[in-house]
Amino acid sequence: MSVKWTSIILLIQLSFYFSSGSCGKVLVWAAEYSHWMNMKTILEELVQRGHEVTVLASSASILFDPNNSSALKIEVFPTSLTKTEFENIIRQQIKRWSELPKDTFWLYFSQIQEIMWRFGDISIKFCKDVVSNKKLMKKLQESRFDVVLADPIFPCSELLAELFNIPLVYSLRFTPGYVFEKHCGGFLFPPSYVPVVMSELSDQMTFMERVKNMIYVLYFDFCFQLYDMKKWDQFYSEVLGRHTTLSEIMGKADIWLIRNSWNFQFPHPLLPNVDFIGGLLCKPAKPLPKEMEEFVQSSGENGVVVFTLGSMITNMKEERANVIASALAQIPQKVLWRFDGNKPDTLGVNTRLYKWIPQNDLLGHPKTKAFITHGGANGIYEAIYHGVPMVGIPLFADQPDNIAHMKTRGAAVQLDFDTMSSTDLANALKTVINDPLYKENVMKLSRIQRDQPVKPLDRAVFWIEFVMRHKGAKHLRPAAHDLTWFQYHSLDVIGFLLACVATVIFIIMKCCLFCFWKFTRKGKKGKSD
């Protein structure tokens, strides 16, 4: 038989193999912005491997256009919010968060909680729009999906998985205070050495820092139980027709894929159904556009600085823009600044403004000396991967924590956006560029990031395919999910043992008293005789 016919027969056999069930059907509960960027990377790889991916998105979704061609199937459900209204809400809340005064703990975190509640109200509205859409639910039911994939910071996917009786995989960066991870996933975060996310603490805490960390833990737990849990518990109970809780339904997730890594996160215990996939977007740099490459090359030995505060920040105040531009004009490096606004008056000849930059490709360029970042996790992972020291100017959410982690690792200098001066920014840049320790530290993190037996993306895809092949991963799910809080902490056992000890002590005391009574009675009787 010729090689040609052998190849054709082999291809036919492979096609039969793939069509006979090796490829699965994935239902995705969509998220927005950076949450979607990471999810999309996983989904595109699943499609490359022959899986069918259906993304469930609202008609208000900012990132989805059903008219655009894509390998992903987009199932749009109607909602009363418009795209413009939804985008305005998000931008307003993020602006509010980034401008919150940090003078007092209670004021700062109470307002953060209000912001999270606002997003929670939108999430529950979208979820109601889906489950009340009988036509859509019937269509999804008949599609016979093999797994649901979602970011739990936007709840609802677990309800769909429960209704359709299919496995659930989460992909998550974090939730405020780790409340979902702890109360729903059973994660272990001992407050004695694991700082709460958004606390900006390290794992080397003083006594007062541990007190502060414990206050954070209690605060987030209280707010979660007070509001988030109750509204979702009630809604899920109504839909399922039985009493249930968000913790119970979320706790049924088969696998939790956490977008973190040990060169970024502080060490803490992990459960068997949890894996780290931090650095999904990290990849070798591609060639730059011609004009940009020429500008980078013109920097000579001084190199370039890459500057971006992310896609969420627009219309920077003129005063802040001029402070930054003035600082950048003081350094010998050329600067590529992602900036969407009016050109600052103090902009130097060494700085070019771009509405968009190929961030990963610039960070991977050999002439890049430093990265000025808002502290988004994706950007930090790319900087780590390419070994670029950072100047962090965090704005909101986990960004202060991320920069604090890099500062602890000796890979970044942190500044405050609202109070920094031109001199502060210029000195910070000179420090990370000229002090070799920053480069050495970030290169160490880079070597750790690259030295993995399996790439984060391949691990993520493996676990999703694993769940599809085995119809779940319940063998990895800890029995802790089936225990009440007092059983989990063995309070019933401790109470029983204390009762036993108390009973034994009581019996011994009674025996001693009886013997003493007998002895004294016998003594009195002897005297009377």
UniProtKB/Swiss-Prot annotation:
Disulfide bonds: none
Single GO cellular component term: endoplasmic reticulum membrane
Keyword DNA damage set for record: no
Membrane topology value: Single-pass membrane protein
EC number(s) stated in the UniProt entry for this protein: 2.4.1.17
CDD domains in the record: GT1_Gtf-like (cd03784)
Subcellular location: Microsome membrane; Endoplasmic reticulum membrane
Glycosylation site list: N67, N68
Primary site of residence: membrane
Transmembrane segments: 494-514
Signal peptide: 1-24
Molecular function via GO: glucuronosyltransferase activity
Function noted in UniProt: UDPGTs are of major importance in the conjugation and subsequent elimination of potentially toxic xenobiotics and endogenous compounds. This isozyme has glucuronidating capacity on estriol and does not catalyze the glucuronidation of beta-estradiol. Capable of conjugating 4-hydroxyestrone, androsterone, diclofenac, and hyodeoxycholic acid.
Name by which UniProt lists this protein: UDP-glucuronosyltransferase 2B33
UniProt source species: Macaca mulatta (Rhesus macaque)
Gene: UGT2B33
